[in-house]
Regions:
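Hinge/lid segment of periplasmic solute-binding proteins
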Residues: 108-163, 216, 301-303, 373
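Short, low-complexity disordered leader/linker segments with a strong preference
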Residues: 1-46, 68, 435-446
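Extracytoplasmic/periplasmic substrate-recognition and gating elements
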Residues: 176, 247, 251-257, 268, ...
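C-terminal capping/gating helix-and-loop segments adjacent to ligand/active sites or protein-protein/ligand interfaces
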Residues: 380-433
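Extracytoplasmic "Venus flytrap"/periplasmic binding protein-like
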Residues: 64-139, 175-182, 272, 276-280, ...
Length: 446
């Protein structure tokens, strides 16, 4: 195994640059000022959709309803492709802030970057003084708080989240007289019994290509029951219980899964599941529409990953939470906040999440008909609302999180699947990089 690379210089440089942008923007005068104003509460505001295209239609519906309620406010809608949104925000900040929107879609994956550059207003007090107080799912609120890197303030209003889901073929389970995979014992038993390699039938399919580590983390923490990503200043990723869970997970490869899983990204994995004889798939709610379209509602079910053992609290790895941010440079924060509050209201939040197939953040949407008719979404919502559920907050606030958890280590994960690297060596390598990144981040907070 190659020596672990310390990421200190690159991480420090990244964060230092972000802090420099923040100081530069704050020092600006009226031209590009980031202080903004409350404004008249009417007139025109600009909204950047952080997934323009797929979500354009639903946002235009919500904007039309908002403008009907507030005829003195006009919303200028700007669709930003999801692949460009972070760079679009960064460019606007670096140019002084004048071109930033009043309101923007903000995901937790890049929230800390915007906070570090001083681009967003905190919204904690605004939530507390509005109809949203006490109406947002607590676990989503905590995910947003953790992702922003500030223990006290929220820098976006959560609107939706995804969640890891264990999808299974109810028709195959029924034919084999197997119980639902609602425990790890049932899961591993079904994976074995539904596999017939000679007949090209498999109990499970996993993700070995792009995005593989995120799904491995889901499986590790769900099985280990470890409820925090950090133990002091060190990650729990390399805890022996997580290493053991990873060993069980990778042992499935080629034993009960197709060999092609080695290079699966999510699209290949989902297509393989929907078009073959595969019993189970671990993905998220986003693939529900594909499953229904290709398999039919009577052949598919989805449940949250099982708790580590019977009677234990469920441990869920945090998924990125989408939200709406109030930009500090806005000259009409009063009108911008009206739009955020309206979009996050029970009716609008429900409408938006029904369209995109995600979990609504507003608890007032929980009893809506569409959720009752979508059992996987209902189960995910109930698990997030369960006070016993423990959400393992991933460190999206680390500048190098995406590098460490994706491209830099995905080739090493493939080596684990192929038996060329042990699960322990992999966990140790990633943990060392995360510990160094956390130490750098903390150093720059003081």
């Amino acid at each position: 195994m190659k020596p672990t690379r310390r990421r200190t210089p690159r991480t420090a440089t990244t964060l230092a640059a972000a802090l420099t942008f923040a100081l530069t923007a704050t020092a600006c005068g009226d031209n590009g000022s980031t202080t903004g104003e409350e404004g008249p509460g009417k007139g025109t505001i600009t909204f950047w959709d952080n997934n323009g295209g797929p979500r354009t239609k639903i946002w235009k519906q919500i904007i039309a309803k908002f403008e009907d309620k507030y005829p003195d406010i006009t919303v200028k809608y700007v669709p930003i492709p999801i692949t460009n949104v972070q760079s679009k925000y960064d460019t606007a900040i670096q140019s002084g802030g004048d071109s930033l929107p009043d309101v923007g879609g903000v995901g937790t994956a890049y929230l800390a970057n915007l906070v570090a550059q001083g681009a967003l207003d905190p919204v904690t007090d605004r939530i507390d003084d509005s109809a949203l107080k006490g109406k947002l799912i607590k676990n989503m609120v905590e995910s947003v708080r953790a992702a922003g890197g500030d223990d006290k303030e929220l820098y976006s209003v959560p609107t939706s989240a995804n969640q890891g889901t264990l999808w299974y073929r109810t028709d195959l389970f029924k034919a084999a007289k197997l119980p639902a995979p609602d425990s790890w014992e049932n899961f591993y038993k079904a994976a074995d019994e539904l596999t017939d390699r000679g007949g090209n039938k498999f109990g499970f399919t996993l993700r070995g290509g792009a995005g593989s580590i995120a799904q491995a983390l889901d499986m590790m923490y769900a099985q280990s029951g470890i409820s925090s990503f950090w133990d002091g200043d060190r990650t729990t990723l390399d805890d022996p219980r997580n290493v053991a869970a990873l060993e069980k997970y990778i042992a499935l490869f080629k034993k009960v899964t197709p060999a092609a899983d080695l290079n699966n990204d999510f699209a290949k994995m989902v297509a393989q599941f929907d078009q073959g004889d595969i019993g189970m798939l671990q993905h998220n709610l986003g693939s529900y529409v594909d499953h229904i379209r290709l398999l039919g509602k009577d052949k598919i079910a989805g449940i949250p990953l099982p708790p580590s053992r019977a009677g234990a609290a469920r441990t869920i790895v945090s998924n990125p939470v989408d939200g709406l941010g109030l930009f500090k440079a806005s000259k009409n924060k009063a009108a911008a906040w009206k739009f955020i509050e309206f979009a996050a209201s029970p009716e609008m939040n429900s409408l938006w999440n029904e369209d995109v197939g995600a979990i609504p953040a507003n608890v007032g949407a929980a009893d809506d008909d569409w959720i009752a008719k979508a059992p996987p979404t209902r189960a995910a919502l109930e698990s997030l609302n369960d006070p016993r559920t423990k959400v393992v907050q991933l460190p999206y606030y680390l500048p190098d999180w995406n590098n460490i958890s994706k491209a830099d280590n995905e080739p090493s994960f493939q080596k684990v699947l192929l038996g060329r690297l042990t699960a322990k060596a992999f966990c140790d390598k990633v943990a060392n990089e995360l510990n160094a990144a956390q130490a750098d981040w903390k150093k720059h907070q003081n």
